[in-house]
Amino acid sequence: DRLDALRWIESADELFGDPFSGVRIVVHGISMGAATAMMVAGEVEHGLHQLPYVKCFVADCGYTSVWEQFKSELSAQFNLPAFPLLHISNWLCQLRYGWNFKEASPLEAVKRCSLPILFIHGDADTFVPTSMVHELYEAKSSPKELWLAPGVDHAHAYRDCTEEYTKQVKDFLNDYMQ
């Protein structure tokens, strides 16, 4: 997903940008999209992806890693421990597809990002535990912001708190989209 998102960002600059246009992009994702946005955040300034027109990120209810999310769901939904099921699944994924669950780590990605990230999370989220946003926030160096939507479950912060959500995002963009 992150590579597709990076290609879209590069395409947007090719389609809409020129050296004088001042293209500015914010990458905003919800749930798995937030995880993708954070994975992109870890690559925008490093390696082959020098994308100076990406100015900031909004990550709404993203998880710390695929491994931790699967582990959480195995426990919450099925009352199963991670071992051996998650370990075997991870091994099979590595054999068949050449990657493993631990590689998909937004937590590690945000550690590499110096651009601003607004973290949003419902404080009643049980699908992606709210504790994960605190881990992400602590791992990210400044600039960063955190807004916890009160009484909100997974991926419903905008739906349930539209006015405050809009204000939080708008204020963040006003601060960082120059």
Residues covered by each model-derived region:
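Hydrolase active-site cap/lid region
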Residues: 39-102, 108
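Acidic catalytic loop of the alpha/beta-hydrolase fold
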Residues: 123-128, 155-156
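Short beta-strand immediately N-terminal to the catalytic nucleophile in serine-hydrolase-like folds
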Residues: 26-29, 60, 120
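Alpha/beta-hydrolase active-site loop
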Residues: 1-17
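Short alpha-helix in the alpha/beta-hydrolase fold that links the catalytic acid
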Residues: 106, 115, 129-138
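Catalytic histidine-centered segment of alpha/beta-hydrolase-like enzymes
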Residues: 152-166
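Short beta-strand/loop motif that positions the catalytic acidic residue
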Residues: 112-114, 119-121, 125
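Gly/Ala-rich beta-loop-alpha elbow adjacent to hydrolase catalytic centers
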Residues: 29-33, 37
